Swiss-Prot record:
<dbReference type="GO" id="GO:0033566">
    <property type="term" value="P:gamma-tubulin complex localization"/>
</dbReference>
<dbReference type="GO" id="GO:0005813">
    <property type="term" value="C:centrosome"/>
</dbReference>
<dbReference type="GO" id="GO:0000931">
    <property type="term" value="C:gamma-tubulin ring complex"/>
</dbReference>
<dbReference type="InterPro" id="IPR022214">
    <property type="entry name" value="MZT1"/>
</dbReference>
<keyword id="KW-0963">Cytoplasm</keyword>
<dbReference type="GO" id="GO:0090307">
    <property type="term" value="P:mitotic spindle assembly"/>
</dbReference>
<keyword id="KW-0206">Cytoskeleton</keyword>
<protein>
    <recommendedName>
        <fullName>Mitotic-spindle organizing protein 1</fullName>
    </recommendedName>
</protein>
<dbReference type="GO" id="GO:0031021">
    <property type="term" value="C:interphase microtubule organizing center"/>
</dbReference>
<dbReference type="GO" id="GO:0005819">
    <property type="term" value="C:spindle"/>
</dbReference>
<dbReference type="Pfam" id="PF12554">
    <property type="entry name" value="MOZART1"/>
</dbReference>
<dbReference type="GO" id="GO:0005737">
    <property type="term" value="C:cytoplasm"/>
</dbReference>
<dbReference type="GO" id="GO:0051415">
    <property type="term" value="P:microtubule nucleation by interphase microtubule organizing center"/>
</dbReference>
<comment type="subunit">
    <text>Part of the gamma-tubulin complex.</text>
</comment>
<comment type="similarity">
    <text>Belongs to the MOZART1 family.</text>
</comment>
<comment type="function">
    <text>Required for gamma-tubulin complex recruitment to the centrosome.</text>
</comment>
């Protein structure tokens, strides 16, 4: 049981470090999104492809928000 607790602590510490790096790089990723990205990479998703998808989704979201604000 202590080993599982130590493992969870190490995972949490790793995620905290990754989140800090993410903030320093101004990625705009929150803990939940970063965690999803890490899990996808662990499952073999290409990190560069994942980055491209995130950028494209942000562009699409920005475009949608801009069109909604001009329509109202």
């Amino acid at each position: 049981m202590a080993n599982a607790s130590g493992n969870m602590s190490a995972v949490r510490e790793t995620m905290d470090v990754l989140l800090e790096i993410s903030r320093l790089l101004n990625t705009g990723l929150d803990m939940e999104t970063l965690s999803i990205c890490v899990r996808l990479c662990e499952q073999g998703i290409n990190p560069e492809a994942l980055s491209s998808v995130i950028k494209e989704l942000r562009r699409a979201s920005d475009t949608l928000k801009a069109s909604e604000s001009t329509a109202s």
